[in-house]
Amino acid sequence: GKSRLAAWMLIVNALQADRGHVFYVAPTQGQARDIMWSTLLELGHPVIAGSHINNLQIKLVNGATISLKGADRPETMRGVSLKFLVLDEYADMKPDVFEQILRPALADQKGCAMFIGTPMGRNHFYELYKYAELDDDPTYKAWHFTSYDNPLLDPSEIDIAKRSMSSY
């Protein structure tokens, strides 16, 4: 669902950012690799010029770079100019990572950010969602989808999981 959408958004935005940079950021670099690396390679295959698993970077045919990063090491994201950014599981990140490091990296190119994740109570991700939901700021938009909206999941499997899993 949301990770596959994020991969498509990264590829499309990178293709529109001639020689530019786009980031996918997860709570840790290991999570970024586990969640996104193979999906990007699969979906982007026709437009990938090269990939480097050691530094988790994919170079596209137009010279743009997709980098996978971990929010637990924010110093690795300083000093870059970004056209697009995905923050996955934003509720599990410190808000300063976006506010102090990544938001400024988007400014000079008027870049966009996509925040995705699983709700984790009322925290900075919740506040951002509520802000976007108000529609007072045209630069923010909120969407809410459940597992039932995911065409890749069988609804009966979701029902079985709901019955067998505890809620916390």
Task: Describe the residue ranges of each PLM region.
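Phosphate/NTP-binding elements of NTP-utilizing enzymes
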Residues: 1-168
